Amino acid sequence: MVRAKSWTLKKHFVGYPTPSNFELKTVELPPLKNGEVLLEALFLTVDPYMRIAARKLKEGDMMMGEQVARVIESKNAAFPTGTIVVALLGWTTHSISDGKNLERLLAEWPDTLPLSLTLGTVGMPGLTAYFGLLDICGLKGGETVMVNAAAGAVGSVVGQIAKLKGCKVVGAAGSDEKVACLKKYGFDVAFNYKTIESLEETLKKASPEGYDCYFDNVGGEFSNAVTSQMKKFGRIAICGAISTYNRTGPPPPGPPPEVVIYNELCFQGFIVTRWQGEVRQKALRDLLKWVSEGKIQYHEHITEGFENMPAAFMGMLKGENLGKAIVKA
């Protein structure tokens, strides 16, 4: 019998999550049936969306999330022992699957790249950047792009794709170390929003002519400031609002209506699961190619040990990670 450890939601979050919100449980998994596989987690992801998605869980449910896993026992010919897969299996060390929810690595995945990238730059965050920028914003060469949380898993890819497409990129991050990383990635302007005197003046200095596209990972007052400096017919892709996820009071006011109206701005929220099938596979191949060629750089913030899943999650929500937050099981 295999014993699986799982992190569950003990109590719903109020404000920032704390260790008391989580409980580690151990269960014995049943023997495999025909068509099933037994999976062992290798890497697990913690992402901002989990803070909001957890509202739909019942107390006692396992926390949700993707992981990279290895098949360690198989009664399914499509997934022999040793196969590496990516799947939404939750915060658990071991799982049983019938194979329907499992995604194999891209056939061209090189041995030189870490498997954990399938949870970051060549996974859900990278796809979010890809489709949010190219489809939602409809990015064109020569435009000016603003992205916040720019040193994170999504924002760092947004900026680098925009540079690949011939755009000017301005990025905001929350530490000098992160700003240095953005400059290494080729951002034209990068600033630490925690140490500047005026966000409005910093944005204006970075791009006096304004912004064509804004990729919003943060929401709140920051986004209102950017909205006021968008160009005519500017496009805003609303990916996240991490600045508001842990609020206990009322949400901040939205952008000035007159700015939205008279500049004819387009706001669109989106969830990356919209894109499936071949269009998704093409995006993954593009991302893998760019990473393999060194055109997109990446940084991972890896926490060792499955027992540290809650700590990694809480640290990510407070911006302690540089790049993609990953847990190595």
Swiss-Prot record:
Q: As annotated in Swiss-Prot or TrEMBL, what is the tissue specificity of this protein?
A: Ubiquitously distributed in various tissues and leukocytes, the kidney and liver had the highest enzyme activities.
Q: What Gene Ontology terms describe where this protein resides (cellular component)? A: cytoplasm; cytosol
Where Phosphoserine occurs, the residues are 20
Sorted keywords for this record are: Acetylation, Cytoplasm, Fatty acid metabolism, Hydroxylation, Lipid metabolism, NAD, NADP, Oxidoreductase, Phosphoprotein, Prostaglandin metabolism
Recall the GO molecular function terms of this protein's record: 13-lipoxin reductase activity; 15-oxoprostaglandin 13-oxidase [NAD(P)+] activity; 2-alkenal reductase (NADPH) activity; leukotriene B4 12-hydroxy dehydrogenase activity
Describe activity versus pH. Optimum pH is 7.5.
Q: Where in the cell is it found?
A: Cytoplasm
Q: Which reaction does it catalyse?
A: 13,14-dihydro-15-oxo-prostaglandin E1 + NADP(+) = 15-oxoprostaglandin E1 + NADPH + H(+); 13,14-dihydro-15-oxo-prostaglandin E2 + NADP(+) = 15-oxoprostaglandin E2 + NADPH + H(+); 13,14-dihydro-15-oxo-prostaglandin E2 + NAD(+) = 15-oxoprostaglandin E2 + NADH + H(+); 13,14-dihydro-15-oxo-prostaglandin F1alpha + NADP(+) = 15-oxoprostaglandin F1alpha + NADPH + H(+)
Q: Binding residues for NADP(+), per the UniProt record?
A: 152-155, 178, 193, 217, 239-245, 270-272, 321
What is the activity regulation entry? Down-regulated by nonsteroidal anti-inflammatory drugs diclofenac, indomethacin and niflumic acid.
Which Pfam families is this protein grouped with? ADH_N_2, ADH_zinc_N
Where Phosphothreonine occurs, residue numbers?
Answer: 18
What positions are modified (N6-(2-hydroxyisobutyryl)lysine)? 178
**Effect of substituting residue 149 to V:** Reduces activity by half
- Note whether Lipid metabolism occurs among the keywords: yes
Partners and quaternary state? Answer: Monomer or homodimer.
Q: What does this protein do?
A: NAD(P)H-dependent oxidoreductase involved in metabolic inactivation of pro- and anti-inflammatory eicosanoids: prostaglandins (PG), leukotrienes (LT) and lipoxins (LX). Preferentially uses NADPH over NADH as cofactor. Catalyzes with high efficiency the reduction of the 13,14 double bond of 15-oxoPGs, including 15-oxo-PGE1, 15-oxo-PGE2, 15-oxo-PGF1-alpha and 15-oxo-PGF2-alpha. Catalyzes with lower efficiency the oxidation of the hydroxyl group at C12 of LTB4 and its derivatives, converting them into biologically less active 12-oxo-LTB4 metabolites.
The Swiss-Prot or TrEMBL record describes its family as follows: Belongs to the NADP-dependent oxidoreductase L4BD family.
Q: What is this protein called?
A: Prostaglandin reductase 1
Organism for this UniProt entry: Sus scrofa
